[in-house]
């Protein structure tokens, strides 16, 4: 296994690994540790079936049931279908037309933050990129005066608030969830600054689209604090833009990274991904359920 840097601050490419080797527990553990340490890892030319993807996901941690069941694989409720190809593998591919929207896959669901697998089956020629931002590098670079506004800040993340917004966008195939699914993910109160359980480095932990409330602040003041922080974390120097190729696999850490889609400007071109969100192996609660 060879590791090559992709960005001065975070992100590495792993080479010398074949798809069939990803079922080896020791290798999966090494890949997970590398993702924790560097924020994300990229493996290219990895031919994954749904079966192989799930085998790897189970070695990386605890794969979570897809939070929108209609967009999951017919054999694996943990395997989410992303893209614009309609019905695939017995499920419907989830199409988010929102564009740039920074988040982490751990907020708003009460999960112990772990990693997410994104695997590219089909991608447009010159669109459909994914952005990653380093939350620990951003923390390390911020001066103490500005940090003081965030060290003790807490926010209420709500997956339902986020899903309602996504359902309102034109062209999406996402619907407002009914009561049983809404109750599945109670709001969580999370510290904006957290210590990564593996690296022990402080990181920012925030998903602005999911923020329902900033504890102790008016809506306007709280929103200003959150958006100023997100604009800082996502400055160009902290961001890596990935241009996908088919058979690319990225595994990213949901504390050390924020990520975002880019504009939906590839109508007429196919895009299809597997996504598996994997909660941390330490089930200790990161935030608190309300």
Where are these regions (language model features)?
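Non-heme Fe(II) oxygenase catalytic core, chiefly the N-lobe of the double-stranded beta-helix
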Residues: 1-249, 255-290
């Amino acid at each position: 296994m060879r590791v090559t840097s992709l960005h001065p601050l975070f992100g590495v490419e792993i080479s010398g690994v074949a798809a069939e080797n990803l079922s080896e527990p020791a290798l999966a553990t090494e890949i997970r540790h590398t993702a924790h340490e560097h924020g994300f890892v990229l493996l290219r030319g990895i031919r994954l079936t749904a079966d192989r993807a799930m085998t790897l996901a189970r070695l990386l941690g605890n794969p979570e049931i897809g939070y929108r069941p209609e967009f999951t694989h017919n054999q694996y409720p943990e395997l989410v279908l992303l893209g614009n190809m309609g019905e695939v593998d017995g499920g419907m591919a989830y199409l988010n037309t929102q564009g740039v929207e920074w988040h982490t896959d751990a907020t708003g669901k009460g999960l112990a933050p772990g990693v997410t697998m994104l695997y590219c089956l089909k991608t447009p020629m010159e669109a459909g990129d994914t952005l990653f931002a380093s939350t620990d590098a951003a923390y390390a670079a911020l001066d103490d005066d500005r940090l003081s506004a965030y060290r003790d800040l807490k926010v209420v993340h709500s997956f339902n608030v986020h899903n309602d917004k996504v359902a309102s966008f034109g062209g999406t195939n996402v619907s407002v969830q009914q009561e049983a699914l809404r109750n599945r993910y109670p709001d969580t109160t999370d510290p904006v600054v957290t210590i990564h359980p593996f690296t022990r480095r402080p990181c920012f932990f925030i998903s602005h689209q999911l923020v329902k409330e900033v504890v102790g602040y008016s809506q306007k003041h709280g929103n200003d604090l959150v958006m100023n922080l997100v604009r800082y974390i996502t400055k160009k120097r902290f961001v890596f833009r990935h241009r996908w190729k088919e058979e690319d696999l990225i595994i990213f850490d949901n504390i050390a990274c924020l990520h975002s889609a880019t504009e939906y400007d590839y109508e007429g071109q196919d895009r299809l991904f597997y996504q598996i969100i994997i909660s941390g192996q330490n089930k200790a609660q990161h935030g608190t359920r309300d």
